[in-house]
C-alpha cells in the first residue's frame, strides 16, 4: 500500500486554530519533522487543508 511522507516546512504560528490542530493531528511536532502515514482519503484531506505548510512525497512500501 502507498504511504505518504509528510514534512512540516512552515510554522503554523499565525494561522487559524483548525490548521494548527490539523498539523498536530498529523503528528508534526516541530519544523522539518517528518512522519509517514498511510495514503487514505482522511489523511489526504488533512494534507489538503495544510498544503501551504507541508511537503508531501509518495513512498512505496
Swiss-Prot record:
Keyword Ribonucleoprotein: yes
SUPFAM superfamilies: Ribosomal protein L30p/L7e
GO molecular function: structural constituent of ribosome
InterPro entries in the cross-refs: Ribo_uL30_ferredoxin-like_sf, Ribosomal_uL30_bac-type, Ribosomal_uL30_ferredoxin-like
Pfam families (UniProt xref): Ribosomal_L30
GO cellular component: cytosolic large ribosomal subunit
CDD domains according to UniProt: Ribosomal_L30
Keywords in alphabetical order: Ribonucleoprotein, Ribosomal protein
Entry keyword Manganese: no
Any one biological process term the GO annotation gives: translation
PANTHER family reported in the protein's UniProt record: LARGE RIBOSOMAL SUBUNIT PROTEIN UL30M (PTHR15892:SF2), MITOCHONDRIAL RIBOSOMAL PROTEIN L30 (PTHR15892)
Protein family per UniProt: Belongs to the universal ribosomal protein uL30 family.
Assembly: Part of the 50S ribosomal subunit.
Name the UniProt record assigns to this protein: Large ribosomal subunit protein uL30
Natural source organism: Fervidobacterium nodosum (strain ATCC 35602 / DSM 5306 / Rt17-B1)
Encoding gene (name): rpmD
